[in-house]
């Protein structure tokens, strides 16, 4: 359901003059009316012409097109965001296809690597280990009192780029930009946070421009105590906030999620968001082929927290479709750098143990090796689906893809690693190696592939189709927790919007132009499931929809009235 348009109420503003122009959430620039210029001491501080936001956006678009590199475009957009947030979101929404890869992946990776070099203006909160005893004071310094969504990172596993120290702040900033652009969550309600626990990146430690704490990363009890101090301070300041963990290292991501998901409304997008969008994509792809996900055999390359999170959600979905847990697990094969995960493999991580295959069941496999490689697994399993979350480029070789295609006429291949420099195989190669028969979805954006005069659109398995809707649903319903069932409901709703399912052709995922509509639908599904699960107060469907409408922010200027502080 589309939101009903209604007249925005005036805002009462205590700021005036140059201070108002320096306030990104309130600044209108040349769009201040003459009455507002008189009332807020702005006469003479702006050019004579009063512009509309669309006129401002057109000028910004022309300026944007003058930049030749993606990183320069990113810097330009961030500058607009830090001076006039309403204009920033109007511009981004006008050109979402073009600008999403610039404000987030893949360009945000380069922005994180060069964070200290391209730093212009502070945004968000930097909490260093050195300041751990001032945690409450730091959060009290945040001027926005009604924070509803926090994205926090410690910068240790930024995309596929590894330890970027405080440069990882680029990820929470970018992620929250998508919460607003795609999910309609007001930027006034969002807060990016980086926990500066040091860095083990020697290049950063040696960089005279590096702005973070120059110290090796704290670990073990020191680390977990510091994170706990942060969580407790957040609960004290904003007890109802949604906290998203982002780009934490594998060794910390799952323990933190398991420890806090029932203590504060929280989730890990790398684990749960990636799983939800992947499962939604697979549900849609399976339905488009006239079947169910439970009928497919699936091989993973990459058995870290993200890969295992996807696998567990696939298993949950196939159980919903009628499989027993044992049968569901027998259809999922996890391969890491040491080969196929089996019950005979030493040093497994806790979250890997339920995803092993019994070695005794593999005795008839066609291989002489003790280490079962990806090629061995593909040759013997004959999978329908191949998913890459390895963070290593080129591991889906021609031999592997052709071997898969031998036994599967319409293979589903999903190289999900970010950024594009880490993708397991390019869509161009996958399409060519399968004679145009593969259905391909990637983690990073790729242009359509032209092969033998036919155009193949490439779906981006983008978490932005999931997490903004989850955030909006949590806020609108007042959910106190994010349950697995809420995530599954998001996946199911995403699959329902697949053009391939709806029309029998096109992308397996919706187009970006429809992302706000999809986010609103996911928000309703998530909110409804939260009520059914008892983590949100039950209301009528109409009341939930109204709450979604009321909380959906639009990039439009409001009239200002003067008031005192």
Curated annotation (Swiss-Prot):
InterPro entries: Aminoacid_DH-like_N_sf, Malic_enzyme_CS, Malic_N_dom, Malic_N_dom_sf, Malic_NAD-bd, Malic_OxRdtase, NAD(P)-bd_dom_sf, NAD_malic_enz_proteobac. A divalent metal cation binds at residues 246-247, 270. GO terms for molecular function: malate dehydrogenase (decarboxylating) (NAD+) activity; metal ion binding; NAD binding; oxaloacetate decarboxylase activity. Keywords: Metal-binding, NAD, Oxidoreductase. The keyword Metal-binding applies. Its EC number is 1.1.1.38. The record marks 270 as: Important for activity. The active site is at 104 (proton donor), 175 (proton acceptor). Divalent metal cations. Prefers magnesium or manganese. PANTHER family: MALIC ENZYME-RELATED, NAD-DEPENDENT MALIC ENZYME, MITOCHONDRIAL. Belongs to the malic enzymes family. This is NAD-dependent malic enzyme. It comes from Escherichia coli O6:H1 (strain CFT073 / ATCC 700928 / UPEC). The lineage of its organism: Bacteria, Pseudomonadati, Pseudomonadota, Gammaproteobacteria, Enterobacterales.
């Amino acid at each position: 359901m589309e939101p009903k348009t209604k007249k925005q109420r005036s805002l009462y503003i205590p700021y005036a003059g140059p201070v108002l122009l320096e306030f990104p959430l309130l600044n209108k620039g040349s769009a201040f009316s003459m009455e507002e210029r008189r009332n807020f001491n702005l006469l003479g501080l702006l050019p004579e012409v009063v512009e509309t936001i669309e006129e401002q956006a057109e000028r910004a678009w022309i300026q944007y097109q003058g930049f030749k590199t993606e990183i320069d475009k990113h810097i330009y957009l961030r500058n607009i965001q830090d001076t006039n947030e309403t204009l920033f979101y109007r511009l981004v929404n006008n050109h979402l296809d073009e600008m999403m890869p610039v404000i987030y992946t893949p360009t945000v990776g380069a922005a994180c690597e060069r964070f200290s070099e391209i730093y212009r203006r502070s945004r968000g909160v930097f909490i260093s280990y050195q300041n751990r005893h001032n945690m409450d004071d730091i959060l009290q310094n945040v001027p926005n009192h009604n924070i509803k969504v926090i994205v926090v990172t410690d910068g240790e596993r930024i995309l596929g780029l590894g330890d970027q120290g405080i440069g990882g702040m680029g990820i929470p900033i970018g992620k929250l930009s998508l919460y607003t652009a795609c999910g309609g969550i007001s930027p006034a309600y969002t807060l990016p946070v980086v926990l500066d626990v040091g860095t083990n990146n020697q290049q950063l430690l040696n960089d005279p421009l590096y702005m973070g704490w120059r110290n090796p990363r704290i670990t073990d009890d020191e680390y977990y105590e510091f994170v706990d101090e942060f969580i407790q301070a957040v609960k004290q300041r904003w007890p109802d906030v949604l906290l998203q963990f982002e780009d934490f290292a594998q060794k910390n991501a799952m323990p933190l999620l398991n420890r806090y998901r029932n203590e504060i409304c929280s989730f890990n997008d790398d684990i749960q968001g990636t799983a939800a969008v992947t499962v939604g994509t697979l549900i849609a792809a399976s339905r488009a082929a006239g079947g169910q996900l439970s009928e497919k055999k699936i091989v993973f390359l990459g058995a870290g927290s993200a890969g295992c999170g996807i696998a567990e959600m696939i298993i949950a979905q196939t159980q919903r479709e009628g499989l027993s847990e044992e049968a569901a697990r027998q259809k999922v094969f996890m391969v890491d750098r040491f080969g196929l995960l089996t019950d005979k493999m030493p040093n497994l991580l806790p979250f890997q143990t339920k995803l092993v295959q019994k070695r005794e069941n593999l005795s008839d496999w066609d291989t002489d090796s003790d280490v079962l490689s990806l090629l061995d697994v593909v040759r013997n399993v004959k999978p329908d689906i191949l998913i890459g979350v390895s963070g290593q480029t080129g591991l889906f070789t021609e031999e592997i893809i052709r071997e898969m295609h031998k036994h599967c006429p319409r293979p589903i291949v999903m190289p999900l690693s970010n950024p594009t420099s880490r993708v397991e195989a390019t869509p161009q190669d996958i399409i060519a190696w399968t004679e145009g028969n593969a259905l391909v979805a990637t983690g990073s954006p790729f242009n359509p592939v032209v092969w033998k005069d036919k155009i193949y659109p490439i779906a981006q398995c983008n978490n932005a189709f999931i997490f903004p809707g989850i955030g909006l649903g949590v806020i609108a319903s007042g959910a106190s927790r994010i349950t697995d069932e809420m995530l599954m409901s998001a996946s199911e709703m995403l699959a329902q919007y697949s053009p391939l399912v709806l029309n029998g052709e096109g992308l397996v995922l919706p187009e970006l132009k429809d992302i706000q509509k999809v986010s609103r639908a996911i928000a309703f599904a998530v909110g409804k499931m939260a009520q059914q699960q008892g983590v949100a107060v039950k209301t009528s469907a109409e009341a939930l929809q109204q709450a979604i409408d009321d909380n959906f922010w639009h990039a439009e200027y409001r009239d200002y009235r003067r008031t005192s502080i």
